[in-house]
Amino acid sequence: MCNQHQTRVLSVSHAKAKFEQTTIERRGLRPHDVLIDIKFSGICHSDIHSAFDEWGGGIFPMVPGHEIAGVVTAVGTKVTKLAVGDRVGVGCFVDSCGECEYCLNAEEQFCTKGVVQTYNSVDYDGNPTYGGYSQKIVVTDRFVVRIPDRLEMDVASPLLCAGITTYSPLKHWNVGPGKKVAIVGVGGLGHLAIQFAHAMGAEVTVLSRSMNKKEEALELGANHYFATSDPATFTALAGRFDVILNTVSANLDVDAYLSMLRIDGTLVSVGAPAKPDTYSVFSLIMGRRSIAGSLVGGIQETQEMLDFAAEHGIEPKIEVIGADQVDEAYERILRSDVRYRFVIDISTL
């Protein structure tokens, strides 16, 4: 192993602590490793859940960030598909066993040995992982994706989590021409889901609590928009959709949403509410309907998503901030005061 790489980071010392600038050591390059100078790091709501230890098991000090865009500055001796100067990205995971049925099927997120997360995780050597609120990161080459030239790096960073989180279920449930899909929520995830579903050729309906975001949703590619605060919405849309993609973290009236599915329709959730949802099993039985979830996507699919986004002009709406604004950004996210993703300019760190 070569010498370690010192890097400045933004870290929290304990749950709900303020961010501090400090220094850590990244591991030296192994044969299949890539050293990346990070240019931008997106802020995901998962970062807040983790930094506040709302899901438990937090590893502190913690360096969040799994929406990483940067440039390769060094490669290991056995790296053949990446070179110094390449524009690259790193998402939610940085390693997996590479041998189980799911890894071999390009679904590393379901690795039976346990996928290594980009931060708040432990690698196979027993060391804690630190994420993208950092100047540099060292990653196994097979977990690095290329950022297409048509995507600016700041815009690309949220796609590494928010983008693949919405693209993957739409693809898995065969959203495309002739399909009617509803997107629940017009936020960090929802505004990308609308664009992906539209580009895939589906008829897209947006479901949001109020009519406040109608104009934005239609501009993003929605064909229809309804407010779920109006009970008449559920009557008007009964039995309409092949797929409903729920992108919000609030608890829903699941039975009401299931009623809007066609026979064999599926309600897919990528938002994670703090409390369990409840529903009647008859809402499933009577229409042979399904409830499902989706966990980001594999590395091959993430690359496919980036290429698809570049080809179809799909971009997240972002607000670029400095390293000294992250605490404020967290507060603004919690009060829904962002359109729609914050991205940290790492040059300010």
UniProtKB/Swiss-Prot annotation:
PROSITE patterns: ADH_ZINC
Keywords: Metal-binding, Oxidoreductase, Stress response, Zinc
Co-factor binding comment: Binds 2 Zn(2+) ions per subunit.
GO molecular function, one term: oxidoreductase activity, acting on the CH-OH group of donors, NAD or NADP as acceptor
Family matches, as Pfam families: ADH_N, ADH_zinc_N
InterPro entries from the UniProt entry: ADH-like_C (IPR013149), ADH-like_N (IPR013154), ADH_Zn_CS (IPR002328), CAD-like (IPR047109), GroES-like_sf (IPR011032), NAD(P)-bd_dom_sf (IPR036291), PKS_ER (IPR020843)
Gene3D superfamilies (UniProt xref): Medium-chain alcohol dehydrogenases, catalytic domain, NAD(P)-binding Rossmann-like Domain
Keyword Oxidoreductase in record: yes
Cofactor: Zn(2+)
Positions contributing to Zn(2+) 2 binding: C97, C100, C103, C111
The protein's Enzyme Commission number: 1.1.1.-
Gene null: resulting phenotype: Cells lacking this gene show significantly reduced growth in the presence of formaldehyde but not methylglyoxal.
Induction: By formaldehyde and methylgloxal, under the control of AdhR. Encoded in an operon with yraA.
Binding positions (Zn(2+) 1): C44, H66, C161
Family: Belongs to the zinc-containing alcohol dehydrogenase family.
Its biological purpose: Functions in the protection against aldehyde-stress.
Protein name: Probable formaldehyde dehydrogenase AdhA
